[in-house]
Amino acid sequence: FPYTTLFRSSIGLVFFARKMLDNVMDGRYADVMERALYNGIISGMQLDGKRFFYVNPLETEPGVSGKLYGYKHVLPERPGWYTCACCPPNVVRLLMSLGKYLWSETEEGVYSHIPAGTEAHFDKMDVTVESNYPWDGRVTYHITGKTEKETILGIHIPSWVRPGSVQVRINGKEKNITADVEKGYLILKRVWENDEVELVFPMKIRKIYANLKVREDAGCVAFMRGPIVYCFEGVDNPGLLQSYHIFEDAKMEEEVCKEGLLEGCVLLKIKARKLETVGDSLYSDIAPVRTLTTLTAVPYYTWGNRGENQMRVWMRGE
């Protein structure tokens, strides 16, 4: 059932993807790591770090989630602790060793899998990454010192980036990278000496559609920006979340949250249509009233931090 996957599965997926990168430098595995790290893993922790839960539901419903048979494990809020708490220390282990998931070193050079701000020291070269990723797509790699010979700096180009849309500058000079991308990695090979590589990934809002074989998500749409998956919560969108329908050509805008618990996060504002039932009858031949409104979507990893309420990743489309 796709709506109640386990948190620890995301951690295992990252472990597996990283091992696969040791076998073959293929950007598909870096994509898997990135998506799991920014969504399926950090969503398990409350933003203040004091609470935790095991499942990554794509939908929660007060009165059902955590209560009804079959949904008791799908908690709508993170509990303080578990009788069997295997995953909290697993998260700590992963985060404290994050460097080896962000980078790889081979005989030919070094490879950046996820462009998070870091200082990385290798036998061949030292690299400092300056970025506000995943909110901002501008990433700068500073190479310190001089390499003894031609050395590869491989930079993962995420699969969510449209081909040809990445801007690359080396020491301020623009570079066409079309011929330099191999299996999802930009391969830059040269003798490095205090150089600077700047990339700009376009961080556009993207609609995501499920294969129609996924029955629960047929006719629905989800949203991503960069590697971040978004969700909708009742605290931001009054009424029943299932009453909202999003247009195929809906206007979508970004807004940086400037205060409160989500300060610094990029929120999405999406035009939608809201349906409201006329009367109290369970069934009626009177069509629902339709009104135009604007929905707010928040990063999925932040859900469940503002009280118990409805949450959905997949919204009805039109």
Which ranges hold each PLM region?
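C-terminal beta-rich recognition modules with glycine/proline-rich loops and embedded aromatic residues
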Residues: G27, D31-N39, G44-G145, R169-I170, ...
